[in-house]
């Protein structure tokens, strides 16, 4: 799988728990969830803020968050976020997620190619 530290983006988690990922992508995420995986505090906020999830999805998301390691918004992430915002047309939450990956040397698993693909230093895994 390459790098061993993975940050799972909100869109991938939502698709995964909504059973909307292709089978191959679902199996890939299954393998990652067996080990240690990461999310950003932004992912936590986004996941818990969704209104359109059913009870089963809500329970799965809460378990997903509880079993993850959450990166908080630390000073080095803030500094990297500012650099990203100055260099790319990217929304603040996505800039924080990208900065979190860069600072912590994580691969980002996301389907948000439009925003993240333009950051050359970011190791992006597209599902």
Task: Cite the ranges covered by each PLM segment.
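Short, well-structured N-terminal submotif of metal-dependent ribonuclease cores
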Residues: 1-39, 49-62
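A generic structural signal for short hydrophobic patches within well-formed alpha-helices
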Residues: 13, 44-47, 78, 116
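Short, structured coil segments at secondary-structure junctions
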Residues: 33, 66, 119-120
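Acidic, PIN/NYN-like endoribonuclease modules and their adjacent C-terminal/linker elements
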Residues: 1-2, 98, 103-127
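Histidine- and aromatic-rich ligand-binding microenvironments
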Residues: 8-9, 39-40, 90-91, 112-113, ...
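Active-site neighborhoods of divalent-metal-dependent phosphate/nucleic-acid chemistry enzymes
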Residues: 23, 69-111
């Amino acid at each position: 799988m390459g790098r061993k530290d993975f940050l799972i983006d909100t869109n991938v988690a939502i698709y995964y728990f909504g059973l909307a990922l292709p089978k191959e992508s679902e199996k890939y995420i299954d393998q990652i969830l067996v080990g240690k995986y990461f999310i950003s505090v932004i992912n936590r906020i986004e996941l818990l803020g969704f209104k359109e999830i059913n009870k089963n999805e809500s329970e799965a998301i809460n378990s997903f968050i509880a079993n993850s390691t959450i990166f908080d918004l630390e000073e080095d992430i803030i500094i990297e976020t500012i650099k990203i915002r100055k260099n790319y047309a990217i929304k603040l939450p996505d800039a924080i997620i990208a900065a979190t990956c860069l600072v912590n040397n994580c691969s980002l698993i996301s389907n948000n190619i439009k925003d993240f693909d333009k950051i050359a230093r970011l190791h992006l895994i597209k599902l």
